[in-house]
Amino acid sequence: MRAASRELRATSSGMVKHVARSSWHVASLHSAMHTLEPFYNWRHRYTAEEDARSPFFGQEHSEFEFTHAVYDHALHPQWDDLGSETLYMKALFVDYDEGYAILEFIGEWNDLLGNDIMFLKRDIVEPMMSHGISKFILVGENVLNFHAGDDEYYNEWYDEASDADGWIALLNFREHVRDDMKAADIDKYFLLGGQLDQMDWRTFEPEDLFEKVSGFVQRRLNA
């Protein structure tokens, strides 16, 4: 059983118990979600399902059946389930020697009702960190909404990554999603903004993307 599934999705007595389905900001993406594949141009170099150290080792994907959905919108079957009901991901590349991972996300990031960060932190990030990963590049152009909850897991992730000389960079997250993160005061745990908001990352090899993002991060940290 995954670690996060053993933890309570705790809500305080004053927390809203129900939130109506959000009106997603990009309607055209709604109807096309089943056609959006995770980036696949690096698959000849890395596949998480064949990586014995990956949380997704041994994962199988149907080419014909849509097994995942965000509300009533089916997702392409190549996306991986991280435990959330609305947020899915793909580990595009992991380099254990250099200590970094490039992770792509799709769906709705809902900490308020789903405590999505708990699943991400406990079941994905922690196993990766146990194998020396401390630098995380999160690609979020297909994250359509963000709903804030508690910041405990963000704080924990930030502290643990920082202690290992690492960081968490957000790449190409939508403006309204970044605004919602800033409003919840969790942007302080990430590197975001500037070049990271408009990077043509698909044109890079993974090590070149890491070098570019790492250079930006170092300039930001040294500013």
Provide a role label for each language-model segment.
Residues 4-11, 17-26:
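Short polybasic linear motifs
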Residues 29-81:
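N-terminal catalytic cores of peptidoglycan-degrading enzymes
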Residues 34-43, 176-223:
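A cross-taxonomic marker for long C-terminal extensions/tails that follow the last structured domain
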Residues 74-119:
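STAS-typified acidic loop motif
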Residues 104-109, 126-150:
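Short, glycine-/small-residue-enriched flexible loop/hinge segments at domain edges that mediate gating
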Residues 119-122, 150-157:
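Charged helix-capping and loop-helix junction motifs
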Residues 138-144, 169-179:
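Short beta-alpha junction loops
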Residues 146-154, 179-183:
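A short acidic (Asp/Glu
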